[in-house]
Amino acid sequence: MSWSDIINNNLIGSGNVSKAAILGFDGAVWAKSDNFNISVEEAVAAGKAFTSLDALLGTGLRLEGQKFLVLNADNDRIIGKQGGSGFFIYKTIQAVIISIYEKGLQPEMCSKTTGALADYFRSIKY
């Protein structure tokens, strides 16, 4: 199964996630949903976000040109919100998984779906 298949089947296909990406800690995009227009700068910032959690709480994070307020950030998960949409970024051993939910989707289900994939990645040491 390819990285794109994982994005499309496990995240987008769940109906709980609007847009998603899997990145390396350096911001290299391993795969993303076709509708996720993440810039290189945004990918690098997301990939490195877990190295400066306190600063992130004060400055927020940009995705697709929109600034999101960071509501919570710990060593495993970052939660952001902007209007009726938001994101969850989960850290695994070798990657970060970004999931965005848009208006009409349940934030809790987006988090649960993304967290389950992150748990699976950790279980296989990825």
UniProtKB/Swiss-Prot annotation:
Instruction: Using the UniProt record, give the first listed, main subcellular location.
Output: cytoplasm
- Record's Gene Ontology CC terms? cell cortex; cytoskeleton; striated muscle dense body
Q: Where would you find this protein in the cell?
A: Cytoplasm, Cytoskeleton
| A Pfam entry, by short name | Profilin
**GO BP term, example:** muscle thin filament assembly
Q: What does the subunit comment say?
A: Occurs in many kinds of cells as a complex with monomeric actin in a 1:1 ratio.
What's the protein name?
Profilin-3
Q: Which gene encodes it?
A: pfn-3
